[in-house]
Amino acid sequence: MVELNFTQKQKQFLKDRKSLKSLVNQHLASDLGETSLSQYLDEFQILYNRFFCFYFFSYGENVFCSEEIFSSQLKNGFFPTKTKDEILSSPALNVIFSEKDFLLLKNIRIFLGMDSNNFFLTEELFN
């Protein structure tokens, strides 16, 4: 098993996960019952852990870390915009993302009031 040595920025980013979970909770609480919300957040936690692995291995030191930047990045989408070729050439992509993961991310964007049609990963990547 590979041991991950996180930088200070990455450690701070991991702590900021709570901000995202709290934000998701605020937006979903009024729309879903407690059971559905709990199940949704459990699935989201699994997906989000996968996202961090992908992000760390792909971007390393460039990971965003402050609360302000974190919130801004969240509002603008989870990932930096990349071209389709850049996305498909990532060695981690096939391991990290499944179609279910993609749909869950898309649903999170909808619940957070983001434009789901402007998501940089499109359905065509999964066809």
Swiss-Prot record:
<protein>
    <recommendedName>
        <fullName>Putative cell division topological specificity factor</fullName>
    </recommendedName>
</protein>
<comment type="function">
    <text>Prevents the cell division inhibition by proteins minC and minD at internal division sites while permitting inhibition at polar sites.</text>
</comment>
<dbReference type="GO" id="GO:0051301">
    <property type="term" value="P:cell division"/>
</dbReference>
<keyword id="KW-0132">Cell division</keyword>
<keyword id="KW-0934">Plastid</keyword>
<dbReference type="GO" id="GO:0009507">
    <property type="term" value="C:chloroplast"/>
</dbReference>
<keyword id="KW-0150">Chloroplast</keyword>
<comment type="similarity">
    <text>Belongs to the MinE family.</text>
</comment>
<keyword id="KW-0131">Cell cycle</keyword>
